[in-house]
Amino acid sequence: MLFGPTGSGKSATLNSLFAQLMAIHRPRLFIAEAGNSFGLFADYCEELELTVNKVSIKPGCGISLAPFADAHRLIETPAVMVSEEELSERIETEDSDEEDDDEERDILGELEIVARLMITGGEAKEEAKLERADRGMMREAILVAARAAYNAGRQIVTGDLQAALYQFAAEEARPEVRRTRAQNMGESLGVFMLGFLGELFDRPGDNWPEADVTLIDLGTLAREGYEAALAVAYTSLVNTINNIAERDQFLDREIVFATDEAHMITTNPLLAPFVVKIVKMWRKLGAWLWLATQNLEDFPNTSKKMLNMIEWWLCLVMPPEEVEEIARFKKLTAEQKAMLLSATKTPYCYTEGVVLVSRIEALFRAVPPSLYLALGMTEKEDKAARRAIMQAQGVSELAAAKQIAHQLDVARGIAKAAT
């Protein structure tokens, strides 16, 4: 977890960490972000002959995220079909039991969370209306939809789940209240089957190109009003990366999935439990989750279990109120708080921070190389400076960033000015 408020040098620090990571360990790197903060880093990797895949999620992008793509495993791994009532009883047991780190992946539980996100829109008042019987019916519908799609020889899409719920609504053997609830849930799914969201979530998904670096710009989904769609998209990204990790678990190459602006992702209280369900097994697959955020205030209390799984906390210079936000999720001693508050920074020079691990508590000073500092410059004046060089010299944005890096080297006294 890298935590750094606005202006703390988070992007530059991440660029430097990513470069060291790729140079030394060469994992398969996935970066999810909003705002194209790492577009220049991806261009830099491509210039160094690493394979790069850039994905931008926006209308007309042609991307399908297929949130229920793993449902076929429920059919390929036979399980005893149970009734809605039995499923709801199992849910109560699952919610109350402590999870074992060695347990197998709960695909049905994961897909239920996705369905709940879509049906409730991630709204607290809608989530509060859900009963255990509703969740049991969702799971039953997922199993029915998965069977229908599997028998048809295709991947399950959101429309299959809607059809299963409408089928339940038409079954006279079910109580009227359950039929009405099934109808309502089916209609709620319709939001994710129209327009841009239908393009993303109601089509079969394709395998991503093999690449050393995959940059996912969340684009339109990062805007206000798309919170539920963003959460569903993130679950699909996690599943996609998980499938690659499972496929390549016997290879010696690891996977790193880094999420910038993580506070945008985890605002939904259902998402942190979903991430925990999958990521807790990633160490066995050689996959690692990195989170970077400028705002812990938006992390709901349900994120505590996810954040407790974090081994390394890198906390860049921060004000007192942000230190208290860290204390919501991680117990801090008075000495640790004092250390966090003592960190300082000098723009374009260095940023101090604190590393908190089980065996290490230390103040550090991050001095990113000029190139990675230039690649991570995201402020408006920084972009304007690059643009001026691009227009004056007819060069690419990456070349302009390199020139700014040289200017920083000159200012730092480690290079001579061009004559």
What are these regions (language model features)?
Residues 1-20, 29-32, 36-38, 55-61, ...:
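Conserved P-loop NTPase motor cores
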Residues 5-7, 299-307, 312-419:
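C-terminal regions of RecA-like/P-loop NTPase motor modules
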Residues 25, 39-51, 57-287, 345-349, ...:
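P-loop NTPase motor domains
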